[in-house]
Amino acid sequence: MASIAVDYAAAGWPVCLGTHLREERARHSRHGALPRGRGLDPGRACSSDRIGCPAPGAHPISPAWQIEAGSDPGEAGRWWREQPEANIILVTGRVFDVLDVPAAAGSAALARMEPAGVRTGPVALSPQPLAADDRALFFVATRGALADEDEWWSCHLDCEPDDFGPVAGLRWHTRGSFVVAPPSRSGRRAAQWIREPGEQPLPDALRLLEFLADACEEARV
């Protein structure tokens, strides 16, 4: 995991340490066994030790993740050498945003984008900690860069860290949010790239948004 985190940082992508899944053991209190919460399912316990964690293995370790996240390869290497089991968190809204849709909708949208000549950037498949369906993550050019501070705008699609748990439809990860990066594991298997990052500039989010929104709408029919 360390070498991959270093590669992300070397590409200029902000990274920070993420929680990981670990084997759950029985937990007891003086009143007997603790109630089993969502984060206590066998094989899906979060390393944060938060009872009923809504996103086991899929959030930063530190509450100060927005301050600590960075793209220094040396620092990233040191972090993961010290905590080799940590998942990789990519912070959005600085270098890139992420359009996050159900995997089936993402596949349908991809099939339509190519004939239409719409260029996509990196696309990842991310299993969800507490949901049966995977999510497709489309990496796009950010609209929340600091250079655009005076013109930054929000919309109802914006996704924030509190928006944990299974959510249908389209989510837009921008400033103040994050995603779990391949090959981190936060569900039944590890996240993976469908289309790996390359040298080409990231696409404009609005070019992809129509296709993704239509695919999500059709999936609800």
What is the predicted role of each segment?
Residues 23-24, 135, 187-188:
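A short acidic, often aromatic-flanked loop/helix-cap motif at beta-alpha or helix-coil junctions
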Residues 138:
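Catalytic core of tubulin tyrosine ligase-like
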Residues 142-221:
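DNA replication initiation modules
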Residues 1-132, 143, 198-202, 206, ...:
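Signature for HUH/AEP ssDNA processing cores
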